[in-house]
């Protein structure tokens, strides 16, 4: 007698499906934050590819874009006397793999990297990755300062909203104080994802003295751990 057909067919998602779902969640969740287990799944995918192929081959970015992303990651979370940089922790691979599975995220990064090159060429006649370190830092500093000023202006607008002086000015709003808006948007995403990649990696977990447990699928890295990781970044204070 043959076994009865099960009433419910359970489909186990493939690794590719899981990765795609994780990538799509990045732009679907407010703040773009990933659960620890999801982030470590991405790191594991990269680790397995390196073990099989000997190296990681970018899935989305071309050679120049990937080099730029790598440079940015080590600027955002540089190496110190305790541990390596975000580049050493696998942030470029982490971001590339997620972007390859999410068209919206891919657009943010390819557009943002192109914007950085265009802006740097105005300042130094070279692409971002070819520019001097002080020029790279200066451009990123300007993005952080613009973001801070824009937030302050927005808060000031909320304070005056509804007052007699504000009535009739609502359609004007509070605009960015410069034309760096696209860069600010991109760099905000990049900082968040670089720090996410860092503190969920083996290097990052050791650095912040947090011992992850993959069983706790709903666990989110504590705010204090994020703040600790951000302290490593010269571009986090705004």
Question: What are these model-predicted stretches?
Answer:
Residues 1-13:
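N-terminal secretory signal peptides
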Residues 48-55, 68-69, 73-187, 197:
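Flexible, low-complexity segments enriched for small/polar residues
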């Amino acid at each position: 007698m043959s076994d009865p057909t099960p009433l419910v067919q359970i489909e186990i998602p493939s690794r590719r499906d899981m990765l795609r779902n994780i990538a799509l969640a990045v732009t679907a969740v407010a703040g773009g934050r990933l659960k620890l287990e999801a982030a470590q799944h991405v790191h594991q995918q990269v680790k397995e590819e390196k073990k099989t192929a000997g190296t990681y081959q970018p899935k989305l970015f071309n050679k120049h874009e990937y080099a730029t992303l790598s440079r940015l990651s080590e600027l955002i979370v540089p190496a110190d006397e305790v541990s390596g940089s975000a580049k050493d922790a696998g942030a470029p691979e982490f971001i590339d793999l997620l972007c390859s599975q999410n068209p919206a995220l891919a657009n943010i990064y390819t557009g943002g990297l192109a914007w950085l090159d265009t802006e740097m060429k105005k300042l130094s006649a070279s692409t971002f990755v070819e520019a001097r370190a002080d020029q790279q830092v200066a451009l990123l500093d300007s993005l952080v300062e613009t973001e801070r000023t824009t937030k302050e202006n927005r808060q000031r607008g909320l304070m005056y909203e509804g007052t007699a002086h504000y009535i009739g000015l609502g359609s004007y709003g509070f605009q960015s104080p410069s034309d760096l808006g696209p860069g600010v948007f991109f760099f905000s995403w990049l900082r968040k994802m670089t720090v996410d990649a860092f503190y969920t990696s083996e290097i990052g977990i050791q650095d912040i003295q947090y011992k992850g447990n993959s069983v706790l699928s709903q666990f989110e890295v504590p705010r204090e751990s994020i703040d600790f990781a951000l302290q490593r970044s010269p571009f986090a204070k705004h």
